[in-house]
Each structure stands twice: as C-alpha cells, then as structure tokens.
C-alpha cells in the first residue's frame, strides 16, 4: 500500500481557498492517501516561521516531502515559509496574481481576506437572510412566505434536501425551501395542495432506493420506513409524480452537495445573489 503523504493547507485567513483548490487537485490521485492539515490565520512572519518548522519536522518523520498548498497574500509572510528544500510548495496566490497584473495592466491591492471576509455588509446580510429563510422553511415546517423562495426542493425523506438548501443559502445567498413528500402525498396523483401555487419554483430530488435504504436504516434500523421495499415504492412514486407534473429532478445518489447545488442552478437559471 502506498505511503500516506502529508498535505498542508496554509492560509492567512480561513483556509477555505487553499483547502478547496488543494483538495480539487488531490482528488485526482485516488490511489493515494493523504494526511490533511489546515493551518489558518498565518498572517505574521513569526507564525509563518513556526509553520515552516512544523513542516520540516513532518518531512523528517515521514521521509517523504509534504505537499504544502499556500494561500497567503502578504509576500513577506509567504517568504517566511522557507520549506522549498524539504517540501513541494504550491502557492496559489502568487502563481497567478503576477500574470493577472500583466494582463490587466494594474497592480493587485494585496488585501487579505477578500474572498471570505465581510467586504460588503449588504452581501453579508443577503447571505444571512437566505440562511434564516432556509432554516425556517426546512422539511415543510413553515409553508408561509413560500412566495419569497427562489427554489423549493421536493423529495422523499432523506434525499438530501436540507443540506442542499443550506449550501445554496450559504454559498449563493439563495432562499431555498424544502418539502418532504409523505406517504400520504405519494398516494395522490397531484402535487401537495400547498405547493401548487409555486409549481414553477419546484425542483425535485430523488435517490437510488438502495442508497436511501442504507441512510434510513442508520437512523431507524429495521423499521418499515427504512425497508428496501418501502424505499423502492416511495422513490418510484415520487419520480412518477415529478414526471406527471413536469417537475425537473435529479438523482443525488452519486453527487456531492456542491454538484447538486450547481446542477440545480444550471437547470433553473437562478444566479447567485451576492
């Protein structure tokens, strides 16, 4: 079995950018295992030198060069991470900012935290408002104000509606409500009455019965709710309902939350709100 390689994500802010880009690259090597560690808020030379020492020690103990993904704006802080002799360093920020400066004929401002900090109060408020809306309209708990929803996700229980709604709210500022199709809903050939006025906002989520059975069985083992026969019935009836009413839908079985959200935006034409 291949040796597990150490991978560091080093950032002057939250580490989200370094993690996202770094993991996007590492996932292309699915035959290897990685020991991942995120080190955020490295915003001084002293902190950077401490990180460099940590990486050096890891290189010694592993006998393999660690992979270091860096997203640090300040060049003096970045230069303090002197580990190029014992690690492979991928500097996301400075690898591209110089090329952009040349192309745009303008110097970068080199401002820390513009990707994930609160740059605009209006944009931040839009995100928080969307999150609150999604939380208040989760699982059909609150059907009031659905007219304000940008999209209403509909599907059987445990098909991925709630995490997708929250992701849409957090990442795009989209007001996403969701409604779980109950056995009573599935016995009817029509959409639930309370959803009919918002037909054009509905987007369906489905899932393979075997996967649904596995998820439900972890929550309520050996119950009728989790039985494979019941899962097959609910999924088949939900998909029939979607087709009958022309509701667009996708399977969440082999998709990440990010992929589900992107697919919904692509199908519906909804754009980010900030």
From Swiss-Prot:
GO terms for molecular function: ADP binding; ATP binding; phosphotransferase activity, phosphate group as acceptor; protein serine/threonine kinase activity. It catalyses: [pyruvate, water dikinase] + ADP = [pyruvate, water dikinase]-phosphate + AMP + H(+); [pyruvate, water dikinase]-phosphate + phosphate + H(+) = [pyruvate, water dikinase] + diphosphate. Keywords: Kinase, Nucleotide-binding, Serine/threonine-protein kinase, Transferase. It comes from the Bacteria. It holds the Pfam family Kinase-PPPase. InterPro entries: Kinase-pyrophosphorylase, PSRP. Its EC number is 2.7.11.33, 2.7.4.28. ADP binds at residues 155-162. Belongs to the pyruvate, phosphate/water dikinase regulatory protein family. PSRP subfamily. Bifunctional serine/threonine kinase and phosphorylase involved in the regulation of the phosphoenolpyruvate synthase (PEPS) by catalyzing its phosphorylation/dephosphorylation. NCBIfam families: PRK05339.1. This is Putative phosphoenolpyruvate synthase regulatory protein. The lineage of its organism: Bacteria, Pseudomonadati, Pseudomonadota, Betaproteobacteria, Neisseriales.
């Amino acid at each position: 079995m291949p040796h597990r390689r150490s991978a560091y994500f080093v950032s002057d802010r939250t580490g989200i950018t370094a993690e996202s880009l770094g993991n996007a690259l590492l996932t292309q090597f699915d035959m290897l295992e990685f020991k991942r560690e995120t080190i955020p808020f490295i915003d001084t030379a002293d902190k950077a030198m401490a990180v460099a020492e940590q990486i050096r020690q890891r290189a010694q103990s592993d006998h393999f060069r660690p992979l270091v993904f860096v997203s640090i704006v300040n060049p003096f802080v970045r230069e303090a991470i002197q580990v190029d002799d014992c690690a492979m360093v991928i500097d996301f920020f400075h690898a591209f900012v110089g090329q952009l400066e040349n192309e745009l004929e303008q110097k970068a401002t080199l401002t820390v935290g513009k990707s994930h900090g609160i740059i605009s109060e209006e944009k931040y408020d839009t995100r928080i408002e969307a999150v609150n809306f999604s939380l208040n309209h989760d699982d059909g708990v609150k059907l009031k104000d659905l007219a304000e929803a940008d999209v209403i996700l509909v599907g059987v229980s445990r098909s991925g509606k709630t995490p997708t709604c929250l992701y849409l709210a957090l990442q795009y500022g989209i007001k996403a409500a969701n409604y779980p199709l109950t056995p009573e809903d599935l016995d009817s050939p029509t959409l639930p009455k309370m959803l009919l006025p918002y037909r054009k906002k509905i987007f369906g989520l489905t899932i393979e019965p075997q996967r649904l059975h596995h998820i439900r069985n972890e929550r309520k083992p050996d119950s009728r709710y989790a039985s494979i026969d019941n899962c097959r019935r609910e999924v088949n009836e939900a998909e029939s309902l979607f087709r009958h009413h022309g509701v667009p839908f996708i399977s969440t079985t082999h998709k990440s939350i990010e992929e589900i959200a992107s697919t919904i935006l692509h199908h519906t034409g909804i754009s980010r709100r900030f």
